[in-house]
């Protein structure tokens, strides 16, 4: 079962990476027209690769864990993307936002404890 949870973390990292690549692709539209297309396509290709790998690993997760446990654990994506957006893109986050992230992490912790 621990392997299943480690794979869920890998899925989260891959899909988070894919989301960050999509953000970079969107930002690349601000580049000069002569380089915009190439840069955007590279970021989008990397996003598709990461998201595709994430889906392949996710299928493996579904063989190992019940969906009712695996899917909520993907909420880790909210945490990872929030942290990455803050530090990589300097996006503002409020205290309320961080309380939400902490609530998600607490929920993941509560679900991982065996009764």
UniProtKB/Swiss-Prot annotation:
It is found in: Cell inner membrane. Pathway: Bacterial outer membrane biogenesis; lipopolysaccharide biosynthesis. GO terms for biological process: lipid A biosynthetic process; lipopolysaccharide biosynthetic process. Residues 44-113 form the EamA domain. It holds the Pfam family EamA. One of its GO terms (molecular function) is carbohydrate derivative transmembrane transporter activity. InterPro entries: EamA_dom, Flippase_ArnE, Small_drug/metabolite_transptr. Keywords: Cell inner membrane, Cell membrane, Lipid A biosynthesis, Lipid biosynthesis, Lipid metabolism, Lipopolysaccharide biosynthesis, Membrane, Transmembrane, Transmembrane helix, Transport. It comes from the Bacteria. Translocates 4-amino-4-deoxy-L-arabinose-phosphoundecaprenol (alpha-L-Ara4N-phosphoundecaprenol) from the cytoplasmic to the periplasmic side of the inner membrane. Belongs to the ArnE family. This is Probable 4-amino-4-deoxy-L-arabinose-phosphoundecaprenol flippase subunit ArnE.
């Amino acid at each position: 079962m621990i392997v299943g949870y480690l794979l869920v973390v890998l899925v989260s990292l891959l899909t988070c990476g894919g989301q960050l690549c999509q953000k970079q692709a969107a930002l690349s539209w601000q580049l000069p027209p002569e380089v915009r297309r190439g840069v955007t396509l590279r970021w989008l290709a990397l996003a598709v690769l990461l998201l595709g790998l994430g889906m392949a690993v996710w299928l493996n997760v579904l063989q190992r864990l019940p969906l009712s446990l695996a899917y909520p654990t993907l909420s880790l994506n909210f945490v990872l993307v929030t942290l990455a957006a803050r530090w990589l893109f300097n996006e503002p986050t409020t205290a309320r936002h961080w309380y939400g992230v902490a609530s998600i992490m607490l929920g993941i912790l509560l679900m991982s404890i065996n009764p």
